[in-house]
Structures are given as structure tokens and as C-alpha cells.
């Protein structure tokens, strides 16, 4: 009678992208889910993962949970707690900028000067189709 909890996010497509998020330790959305599950149940999920609807692929952070899942472990030192801590540090940094009246417009492939203080999430700039679609609605970055 196995009662382990696993947080899985279902995605339509982009199998390689989501597998790499896990491998690179950039799965913030899953970390947020894990934090919420831990608050609600008192225990953190055993593993986190993405199920890709288009291909049926399942990528997960721990072995021996789903027989056909592909394991993608984050780098050593990347945990739910570290991801959430970096998100909190990023929020604090950005909130300080807003309080000071600073709104930073980050270019594609931003230089180091756009990166936050140590302990914050990396600043990557606009991301292809997804961000550009939203930025056009806001009045910029048309091509």
C-alpha cells in the first residue's frame, strides 16, 4: 500500500523544455506546488515531475515511483527549499526596485548588469513566442 505523494504538472507539449527544467534545477512552478502540498498535508512530495500530453512522456525527479518515467534529477544542492528561497530573494529585490520607482525592461539575452543579487533567480529576458505574444499586447517588441 504505497501512499507517496508526487506533484505532477501536465503540459501540452515542449517535452525537451520541461525535461531540461528539471535537469537544470529551474522547475520553480513545481517547487511552488510542492510547498503548497507540504503546507496542506504536512509532508513534502516524494518527487516532482511533468507529464507531456502530446507524447505521453513522464519526467520525474526520483526513481522507483512510476515504472516508465524518465528520471531527470536536478543538480546537487537544488531543492524545493532552495528554489523557493531564490524566488523569495528575487521578490524582495524586485519589490525594492518597484518601491524606488524602478521598472527594469530586460532585453533578450540580457548582459550581467541585469542579473540580481546573489541568491536570486537568473534573469533571462523575453522568451520567444510566449513572452513576445504578451509583450505585444502591452505595446512593445513587435517584429
Regions found by a protein language model. Give the residues of each.
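RecB-family 4Fe-4S metal-dependent nuclease core
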Residues: 1-143
Amino acid at each position: 500500500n504505497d501512499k507517496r505523494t508526487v506533484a505532477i504538472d501536465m503540459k501540452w507539449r515542449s517535452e525537451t523544455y520541461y525535461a531540461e527544467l528539471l535537469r537544470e534545477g529551474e522547475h520553480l512552478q513545481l517547487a511552488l506546488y510542492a510547498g503548497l502540498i507540504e503546507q496542506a498535508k504536512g509532508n513534502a512530495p516524494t518527487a516532482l515531475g511533468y507529464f507531456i500530453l502530446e507524447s505521453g512522456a513522464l519526467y520525474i525527479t526520483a526513481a522507483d515511483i512510476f515504472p516508465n518515467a524518465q528520471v531527470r534529477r536536478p543538480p546537487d544542492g537544488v531543492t524545493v527549499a532552495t528554489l523557493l528561497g531564490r524566488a523569495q530573494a528575487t521578490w524582495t529585490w524586485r519589490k525594492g526596485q518597484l518601491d524606488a520607482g524602478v521598472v527594469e525592461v530586460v532585453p533578450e539575452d540580457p548582459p550581467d548588469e541585469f542579473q540580481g543579487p546573489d541568491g536570486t533567480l537568473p534573469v533571462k529576458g523575453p522568451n520567444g513566442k510566449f513572452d513576445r505574444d504578451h509583450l505585444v499586447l502591452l505595446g512593445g517588441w513587435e517584429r
